[in-house]
């Protein structure tokens, strides 16, 4: 009986220690709509913040802006009279309405994630950590976005870090 109690306690402890995780399918997006799947991003709760581990293929090599957007849609949307790829996702997640694009480690909006690195084969597999996001509940139902260009986490010389057009999107 004592062994059963110890085993039961161990199982409960392991279950309690298991952190939440979410797998997001990411698709190429254009002004015409949602395209082919480029892979997935696994999001794990860790004691250091949310960890985003991409398993994406078919991207342009280099650094790409990576953000959580405010709305849970990857459909095209209109902005200033133009149809925008994944425009229905809205802007970067900014629940406190800071209006500041200061990067994943500063006091700007929490939708800023560290940039995603894509190797010369077009694969993104390196995880990034978002220390200001601590729970999947903060981003559930929002859009995860990969931009065409890099991100300097500032509004100069180009707005929103200079990441440019939206290239890939998935709903968390």
Question: Model regions: which residues?
Answer:
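N-terminal leader/targeting pre-sequences
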Residues: 15-172
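Gram-negative bacterial Sec-dependent N-terminal signal peptides
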Residues: 1-19
């Amino acid at each position: 009986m004592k062994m059963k109690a110890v085993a039961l306690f161990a199982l409960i402890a392991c279950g309690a220690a298991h952190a939440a995780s979410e797998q997001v399918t990411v698709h190429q997006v254009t002004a015409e709509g949602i395209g082919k799947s480029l892979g997935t991003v696994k999001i794990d709760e860790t004691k250091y913040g949310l960890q985003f581990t991409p398993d994406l293929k078919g991207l342009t090599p280099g650094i790409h802006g990576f953000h959580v957007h405010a709305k849970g849609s990857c459909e095209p949307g209109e902005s200033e009279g133009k149809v925008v790829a994944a425009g229905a996702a809205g802007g970067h997640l900014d629940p406190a309405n800071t209006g500041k694009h200061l990067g994943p480690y500063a006091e700007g909006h929490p939708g800023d994630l560290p940039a995603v690195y894509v190797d010369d084969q077009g694969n993104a597999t390196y995880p990034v950590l978002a220390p200001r996001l601590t729970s999947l509940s903060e981003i559930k139902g929002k859009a995860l976005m990969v931009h065409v260009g890099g991100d300097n986490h500032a509004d100069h010389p180009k707005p929103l870090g200079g990441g440019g057009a939206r290239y890939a999107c998935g709903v968390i």
